[in-house]
């Protein structure tokens, strides 16, 4: 006869893993979750603290080795993601912290302000002209008002 091996289905195995990661009353300090809730600590640092607590409990037989491997792999991935985010943030700051040339130089802006008011044929300064044409396409005449 063929020896029958009972393989656990994936959902049951996942449920066992989740139950294995619950805070156990023996060995895990119960005051840590309430201590962390009062502080303004980023989520990644909370996970890192919890993972460091789990790794401190390696000697206990209650925590299976696959749970420890899972915690270690998640912690390592988080560390890599944080390093990548830090590099992206540094590049972003470097790009926008460089001094940029002003779009209008001082001489050009003085010329632009001198030409802002429109003079009519008699040389009298009239009202300022519109920079854009009206939407209906009509031209603006000074004599309308």
From Swiss-Prot:
Q: Where are the disulfide bridges?
A: none
Q: Which GO terms describe its cellular component?
A: extracellular region
Classification via InterPro entries? Neuromedin-U_amidation-site, NmS
Q: Give a brief account of the tissues where this protein occurs.
A: Expressed by the skin glands.
Q: Any idea where this protein resides?
A: Secreted
Matching PROSITE patterns, A to Z? NMU
Q: Mark the residues carrying the PTM Asparagine amide.
A: 136
Q: Which UniProt keywords apply?
A: Amidation, Cleavage on pair of basic residues, Secreted, Signal
Q: Which residues form the propeptide?
A: 28-89, 92-117, 140-145
Q: Where is the signal peptide?
A: 1-27
Please tell me where this protein is predominantly located. secreted
Q: What else is known?
A: Isoform 3 encodes peptide NmS-33, at positions 92 to 124, as a result of splicing out of an exon that encodes a processing site which generates NmS-17. Similar 33-mers and 36-mers have been isolated from human and from mouse and rat, respectively, although they do not arise by alternative splicing.
Q: Which family does it belong to?
A: Belongs to the NmU family.
Query: Which named protein is this?
Result: Neuromedin-S
**What lineage, starting at the top, does this entry show?**
Eukaryota, Metazoa, Chordata, Craniata, Vertebrata
